[in-house]
């Protein structure tokens, strides 16, 4: 009965042809094959569905997630222990068709890499963001390295939504930005309002813009800019208070 139910619901709500049908890889046979057979015989044409997207299974510590094994997590339960953006990073760190082994080591690794992304982006935004937003010439498309990274990112996403390839490019751009931020005091000047200027400031602004577009808008891995800047301001204020306490003790 459930095969014909899905064919009937699809026809009622999506029409005789629709673009994408999703589902787990365990449903390919017999469920989805039965849907195809029923729908095409009923309607007299094919294909009814243009693209079938089958996701891999989620395993927990090497075992299939199931209620019978007692290792079943709902999204709500996972979010009680894992930041939503870290969870997203964890799940897209592998092509969606492949199984994902959901374990604490994987979550910790994702938390480290995601934290590096947000921290690096936030530092760059705080020091170069205002200049970058005002200077339209800082567009990342000016820089061949970033155009190449964007092309590789898009090629990965065009290859059946290979988000793992896309994340590799994000990590590479973060590494570039991190290196420049660590060394920027050597070849940049600071204005009275705290904005860095100098020979590489445009490139750093381009890196920030690239991350905003691809890590933020496309992959959805960045918090709101206001939240990032507020967190950085709070951290800097806390550091200042500690420094003042130390000075008083001395």
Protein language model features and the residues they cover:
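Alpha-helical recognition segments enriched in aromatics with Gly/Pro capping
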Residues: 1-127
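Conserved nucleotide- and phosphate/pyrophosphate-binding catalytic cores
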Residues: 67-250
């Amino acid at each position: 009965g459930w095969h014909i139910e899905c064919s009937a619901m699809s026809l009622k709500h999506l029409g005789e042809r629709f673009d994408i049908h999703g589902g787990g890889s365990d449903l390919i046979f017999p469920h989805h094959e039965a849907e195809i057979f029923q729908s095409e015989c009923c309607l007299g044409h094919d294909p009814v569905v243009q693209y079938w997207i089958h996701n891999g299974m989620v395993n927990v510590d090497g075992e299939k997630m199931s209620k019978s094994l007692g290792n079943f997590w709902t999204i709500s339960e996972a979010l009680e222990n894992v930041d939503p953006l870290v969870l997203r990073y964890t799940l897209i760190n592998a092509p969606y068709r492949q199984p994902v082994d959901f374990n604490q080591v994987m979550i910790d690794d994702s938390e480290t890499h995601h934290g590096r992304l947000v921290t690096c982006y936030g530092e760059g935004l705080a020091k170069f963001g205002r200049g970058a937003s005002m200077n339209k010439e800082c567009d990342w498309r000016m820089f061949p390295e970033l155009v190449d990274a964007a092309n590789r990112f898009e090629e990965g996403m065009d290859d059946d939504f290979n988000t793992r390839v896309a994340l590799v490019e994000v990590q590479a751009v973060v590494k570039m930005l991190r290196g420049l931020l660590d060394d920027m005091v050597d070849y940049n000047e600071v204005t009275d309002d705290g904005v860095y200027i100098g020979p590489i400031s445009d490139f750093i602004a381009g890196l920030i813009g690239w991350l905003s577009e691809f890590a933020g808008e496309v992959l959805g891995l960045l918090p709101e800019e206001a939240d990032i800047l507020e967190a950085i301001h709070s951290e800097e204020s806390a550091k200042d208070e500690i420094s003042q306490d130390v000075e008083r003790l001395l």
